[in-house]
């Protein structure tokens, strides 16, 4: 296994309930290091760019509105097989189908308000990280 970096967002439904510490604890317990983190309020342009892959989907507008509705915490995570490890600790998109002990099972409100985003591949992670962090902000 190789050490990888992946990208994570703690979404507005998580930050409004002050879950950053609880979610970070689950991430770290899964063996991932948080090597960069900042709390921001996404602009509409940032959210539209970030979720451009979904632009033609019927939920795109609602997704963008949700992501700009409150603060988010953007993160760079590092560890062995980080992308898969993070996806495992996040759990299924639908919290009712997520495994016990996962972030979404414990904290998500719904499929739409599912508390966390994680990159789906190392290549995607590199693109997503570059959207929110400069090299000198990643201090792992």
UniProtKB/Swiss-Prot annotation:
Its EC number is 2.7.4.6. Its cofactor is Mg(2+). The active site is at residue 117. InterPro entries: NDK-like_dom, NDK-like_dom_sf, Nucleoside_diP_kinase, Nucleoside_diP_kinase_AS. It is an enzyme of class 2 (transferase). SUPFAM superfamilies: Nucleoside diphosphate kinase, NDK. Gene3D superfamilies: Nucleoside diphosphate kinase-like domain. It comes from the Bacteria. Keywords: ATP-binding, Cytoplasm, Kinase, Magnesium, Metal-binding, Nucleotide metabolism, Nucleotide-binding, Phosphoprotein, Transferase. Homotetramer. PANTHER family: NUCLEOSIDE DIPHOSPHATE KINASE, NUCLEOSIDE DIPHOSPHATE KINASE DDB_G0292928-RELATED. Belongs to the NDK family. This is Nucleoside diphosphate kinase. It comes from Rhodopseudomonas palustris (strain BisA53).
